[in-house]
Amino acid sequence: MAMICAQAPLAFADQSQQENTGNVRHFHLHGSGTTNPSKLIWLAMDKLEEMAGSTLRMTYRSVGSGTGASDWASANAGDFASTDYGLAADSSAPFMQLPFQIGAVSLFHNVPGVGTGVMKLSACTVAKIFTGAITNWNDAAIAADSGLSLPSQTIKVIWRSNGSSSTYGLKGYMYAGCQAVYSTAPTPSDGADPFSGNHLYSTGVTGSDSMRLAIGANEYSIGYIDAGHGHLDNLSEVSLKNANNEWVVTKEGDPAGRLTANIPAVVTSTVKATFPQNSGATNYAGDWSGVNLFNKAGAGVWPICAFTYLHVRTTYTDTATTGVVRAFVEYMLSPAIQDKITEFYFYPLDSAFAAEVKTAVSTTLSAASPVWTWVDPYILSYNTGIAMGYTTFSPKRQTYAEYERGLFKKNIAALEASVAALKTELAAKTGNDDAADERTLALAAVSFVVAVIAVIVGSIAMCRGGRSSQVMRVVGM
């Protein structure tokens, strides 16, 4: 029993070996890599474990693209990896490189009174700022781009000190958009202090959270981060000029009259022609190290985009592992997960492209045995042997923890609606009705206390439900 419940070590571990004999069926899947999709991957793994007809244990180490790539290059280190950039092919151990989501890197600033989209910066102006050629917000180049008269304040340049896909994306944009200023081709391995120059003020931070906090805490600063997380903190986004000479932002609603970019539209037929090819078709087992989505042409295209990849072997020593890997990747490319990506501040693939990648996976991993089967929850008449089979995923299989999470989300939504209504009521009060104000404040206080209690109770119930479901699975075995 202890062997069943223990977590398998992942770093530099061999490929998983499945137990699939007689009535003993225990399946495993382990990977590591970039932090960006970690929450999405964990969600997908939770759902698959829940829906599986057999004991299924899946883990993902959120360690960064660099460590994930190093793990992957170390013989049979785990079953899959994930990075925010393509890797070189390995003829001795062939593997597929499978895009499954798109990230958009944005520039955010903290110039008081200048909101999202108001400030426009071309690639050359951005390059001059980050190389120290421009050090003051009242520089003529900034005024020419934006039409703004900004105060004479030192630009506080904030950059990632530990190497990141965001730095790679920004340098790729500057290189693709203005080689007259920035002529060094970027590489994913660019590490600490990636921008040299005569900055009057610059500082490095580690991680996306540190970046967003640093921008928010320092007036007259500028930095870069994946777009969704910047918007989460209501940071002011810079409007960038794309290859079609459009001033675009990633923020929804065309703020300041700027065009909201269509992120998935970056994958045009022209871009797909730059993918590795084999007999006129995309070679997902080819060399993807030269593929990028920087400053690509197209209407409404955002100029700093990047794929997030899943890397999986073309063959595994255990065909049952092939089956689990195939099922996991197919699920990541299915509408069930693609539709969730925006909740984690990234962007899904175009549905046709996602289907193409999914077909490539299914074809390449056709040696899977067993092949996991998906049961459609809306079919009233189905083969019971399939639905109750060991290697099936059925949405009808759920846990109490999942049920509690659903209630928890509904309660939070109701609370948010109540708070919004209270804000509207308070905003509408223009007189000196102290009694009404006191009633409203009292109601708000009661609502807040009830909400806190609901959150605490919901969290406890959710955790207890999760533990209970795990115990029930072990007992059931």
Label every model-predicted segment.
Residues G466-M477:
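Intrinsically disordered cytoplasmic terminal tails of membrane proteins
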